[in-house]
């Protein structure tokens, strides 16, 4: 009864007007897909920027090495399948200086069965360098008693002249006069865990680190030719001078007889006149956050444009279908 007393124009008044159906936003699975895709992209972006912030950006440049330095360190850690008493280690350089490395290095008894092989090295080193797991320059000692080992681990640091030279590991007497080591005792199968020049840097993996060499015969010779490149490293935490090198290798069976070259392991190193400077730069927190926000905003804007284009196309297709339906209905009538 009260409704009949209200004027018609007041009854028609609506404080919350209804939109026409064609302007209403229809829910669809497409919007959910775009939301999930955009969320995944933003998460990947944030993760990549965090990784870049932690690792930093590495820049390298070449320059002429003009520093004057007379000496450098030679770091070595090698295991050879021969007793220590059957080995001799020397370093000779272009100035004809001879370093009796047998006395300067540590020779430690080991066992052949404990030496890594090419298959075990590949299995353990597929995903990471051998040196990444080590924090000390040289690992702990073996458990072999003196005189009981079938192999010899040679490790330590030598101070040599900063000129071209050669480190050679041979058997006493072979190539230096009358041999006192039996022929059948020669076995220069070896595993090089560490060979570097300059200050020790665990993150720098050189070409001979983790290298395995198998001797196919008793009078076997391994020849390694190294091109040593001085390297200057600088980061936010430290800076130092070290070296890295490239490798060319060759192996051959020596011919026995007077005047023949001795079997063994020969490492020739040549110093390059060029040097490389490595600089690690870490972006600050503010620039990283601004970069994340800028790229995230760009992704959201592009995603909204794409969604709007798809929505307009879908709306146009729906309108055309409705129009065709109305025309068909009118023709039928």
Curated annotation (Swiss-Prot):
Its main location: endoplasmic reticulum. It is found in: Endoplasmic reticulum membrane; Golgi apparatus membrane; Endoplasmic reticulum-Golgi intermediate compartment membrane. The modification Phosphoserine is found at residues 317, 319. GO terms for biological process: endoplasmic reticulum to Golgi vesicle-mediated transport; intracellular protein transport; retrograde vesicle-mediated transport, Golgi to endoplasmic reticulum. Keywords: Endoplasmic reticulum, ER-Golgi transport, Glycoprotein, Golgi apparatus, Membrane, Phosphoprotein, Protein transport, Transmembrane, Transmembrane helix, Transport. It is a multi-pass membrane protein. Residues 52-285 are lumenal. Residues 1-30, 307-333 are cytoplasmic. GO terms for cellular component: COPII-coated ER to Golgi transport vesicle; cytoplasm; endoplasmic reticulum; endoplasmic reticulum membrane; endoplasmic reticulum-Golgi intermediate compartment membrane; Golgi apparatus; Golgi membrane. The chain crosses the membrane at residues 31-51, 286-306. Pfam families: COPIIcoated_ERV (PF07970), ERGIC_N (PF13850). Glycans are attached at residue 187. Belongs to the ERGIC family. Constituent of COPII-coated endoplasmic reticulum-derived transport vesicles. Required for efficient transport of a subset of secretory proteins to the Golgi. Facilitates retrograde transport from the Golgi to the endoplasmic reticulum. This is ER-derived vesicles protein 41. The gene is erv41.
